[in-house]
Amino acid sequence: MCIRFFMEIIKTSIDGVLIIEPRVFKDSRGYFFESFSQREFDEKATPILGHSINFVQDNESMSSYGVMRGLHYQRMPYTQSKLVRCVKGAVLDVAVDIRKGSPTFGQHVSCLLTGRDEEGVKIAEQFAKESSISNPQSIINNQSSVINHH
């Protein structure tokens, strides 16, 4: 028997920012979930977004309690869509719409991501992103649609 994994895609109040909830299989041994599937993301998110996104780089960072990382953004032509998930600990992740001419310019969506919930947030290009660490030794996984240019 082949099990098909599912993720739930939830729209937020700002176009381009989505909450991603994976299906988690838990039992007495622990848990298992597919943290990302490009195929399933395309099937479920592309109709909402109106375009597909191919994530090409995967980053991980560890931060201590009280650290605030942000507001980070990229300028054209290096703007990135991001898919952010907290692996361990807790982080308040904030996405701010900095798209000129957008009806939600200057507005933000904040999501409390924890290593216990396994959910993530998809952030569109031309958004500023900030992460505020609210647990000791928090680990964040961050996928991006464009290779970082340092």
Q: Locations of the language-model features?
A:
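Compositionally biased, low-structure terminal segments
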Residues: 6-7, 128, 141
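Conserved metal-binding segment of the jelly-roll/cupin
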Residues: 113-129, 148-150
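Short, basic, low-complexity termini and linkers enriched in Ser/Thr/Gly/Pro
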Residues: 1, 131-148
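Non-catalytic, conserved peripheral segments adjacent to functional cores
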Residues: 5-119
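Non-transmembrane, interaction-prone segments in cytosolic or luminal domains
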Residues: 14, 35, 125, 134, ...
